[in-house]
Amino acid sequence: MSKKLENNGIWESSRMMLPQHREELLKRRSQQPEEHRPPRREDLELMRDRILLPVMISIVKKRIQAIEASSEALKHLYSKVAQVLLQDIQKDLSKVEQTMLDERIDLTQEGKDTEMIWYRYSFHGYEDTFTITRDYMRTEVSVRIGRYSDRLITALYARLQDHKQK
């Protein structure tokens, strides 16, 4: 970059940028060390959600198939409710995945055995691992599906109340 353009407040604040200046800026940014900080609690919860939500989705899908194959008199109702529940969980998973992309959080499964699953994550240059036990996963998935169900029932009751008032 020419001496005339360096440290020139007018040029630096300009929104137009020539390709060679952009290359210089990108080169300078790549030379700066990236901040290595451990993830906050919210970031760890995001990673945990990214692990648990797909498990919940597969469980709900299996239950939908079991309901549809049953001879239950209200199987169509149960199936439809489970499908709404599934859509809600899938929507949340999509949000979690987008947030992880935006936050540059990378999560990969490293290994597993009969009791635990190990994950490696990268967060803004900081790398570490964590472990989730299968017992914790079972319990947490059960609790979360219960919360999603409660939220769905609450929304249904609220809608019924609105309908009665009209």
Regions found by a protein language model. Name each.
Residues 1-2, 164:
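Intrinsically disordered, low-complexity and often Lys/Arg-enriched segments
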Residues 2-68:
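Long, hydrophobic N-terminal alpha-helical segment
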Residues 39, 46-49, 78, 82, ...:
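Hydrophobic alpha-helical segments and helix-packing faces
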Residues 51-54, 58, 83-94:
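Generic structural signal for well-ordered, non-transmembrane alpha-helical segments
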Residues 67, 73, 78, 82-84, ...:
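Conserved non-transmembrane functional hotspots
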Residues 88-166:
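Low-complexity intrinsically disordered segments
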